[in-house]
A protein has these predicted regions:
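N-terminal, positively charged regions that mediate nucleic acid binding
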Residues: 4-40
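Positively charged, low-complexity, intrinsically disordered RNA-binding extensions
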Residues: 5-6, 10, 46, 99-170
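Short, hydrophobic beta-strand segments
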Residues: 8-14, 51-58, 95-106
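Short, conserved charged micro-motifs
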Residues: 20-21, 62-67, 108-112, 145-146
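Short amphipathic alpha-helix segments
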Residues: 22-37, 71-72, 109-121
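Short amphipathic beta-strand starts and helix->beta connectors
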Residues: 36-43, 82-88, 113-125
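N-terminal, charged amphipathic alpha-helical interaction modules
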Residues: 38-70
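Helix-adjacent hinge/juxtasegments
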Residues: 63-101
């Protein structure tokens, strides 16, 4: 007979904190404006929060790479996972400058969610995994199984940043 005890559960999410990104962008711009090697490069970093994008621009690819390095260092300092960034191709912009768009990953894409669910199912642990919009919910009777699933997921690389939230225990 099924017990009426509610399941323990947690959510697997992928979220980037935009206020932290905003801070990192401001700090990166400050450093870029002070750097002698980037002085005349007309470099810029613009966060477009509504689009979950960062736009980078600089006078050439070499300087754009330097701008990216500065930004990444500032993001790491603010605990923003670099795995949560997807880099578009470098394209020509106005004049002789180049630009690049970075997309901030918010939510788990359906293909990735399916891979995560499959890994959990194949592990034969006594849990259920279900896709709920842009997150995956894992539930099970015993907490140890949930802990094992977390360990399993930490060891797997889906090429995305994942966090475990909404841990509910009975």
């Amino acid at each position: 007979s099924k017990s009426t005890m509610p399941d323990n559960s947690f959510d697997i999410v992928s979220k980037i904190e935009l206020p932290e990104v905003s801070n990192a962008v401001q700090q990166a711009m400050k450093e870029i404006q002070q750097r002698f090697d980037l002085k005349d490069s007309h470099s810029s970093i613009e966060l477009r929060e509504k689009e979950n994008k960062i736009l980078l621009q600089s006078s050439d690819e070499f300087k754009l790479k330097a701008v990216t390095d500065v930004l990444q260092a500032k993001l790491v300092k603010r605990s923003v996972p670099l795995k949560g960034l997807t880099y578009g191709t470098v394209t020509p912009a106005t004049g002789s400058s180049v630009r690049q768009e970075i997309t901030l990953q918010q939510g788990i894409a359906i293909e990735k969610a399916r891979e995560i669910v499959k890994l959990i199912k194949d592990s034969k642990k006594k849990v259920q995994a279900s896709i709920q919009g842009d997150l995956v919910r894992v539930s099970g009777k015993d907490r140890d199984s949930l802990q094992e699933v977390m360990a399993l997921l930490r060891g797997a690389d889906f090429g995305i940043d994942m966090q475990f939230t909404n841990y509910r225990t009975n």
